[in-house]
Amino acid sequence: MLLPKISILLYILVVLQETAAVRGALFRSGRAVPFERVVGQQDFLRFGRAGMASGVGGGSEGGPDDVKNSYIRVNGEPEIVYQ
């Protein structure tokens, strides 16, 4: 009675581990790129705190521009997609 339950749990663990390994291999090979939305943090990610304080990437007051952009992260680097 206990053996079928243990074998099912073991099967689920193996399948989950293999799925994660395959996704990681595809990502590292460049065949699959997971996209992560970045909302409002693009200036911070690209220029750091000093860039935000000096107004880099923003208006004269140092804030972000009023232009509505979409940001995605590709291989860990933020990319701008203009709408």
Curated annotation (Swiss-Prot):
Tissue expression pattern: Each flp gene is expressed in a distinct set of neurons.
Claim: Secreted is one of the keywords in the record: yes
Family label: Belongs to the FARP (FMRFamide related peptide) family.
Modified residues (Phenylalanine amide): F47
Protein task: FMRFamides and FMRFamide-like peptides are neuropeptides.
Signal peptide residues on this chain, from the entry's feature table: 1-24
Naturally occurring in which organism (per UniProt): Caenorhabditis elegans
Protein name in UniProt: FMRFamide-like neuropeptide 23
Propeptide cleavage-removed residue intervals: 25-36, 50-83
GO aspect biological process, one term: neuropeptide signaling pathway
Keywords: Amidation, Neuropeptide, Secreted, Signal
Record's subcellular location: Secreted
The keyword Repeat belongs to this UniProt entry's keyword annotation: no
Gene Ontology CC terms, in alphabetical order: extracellular region
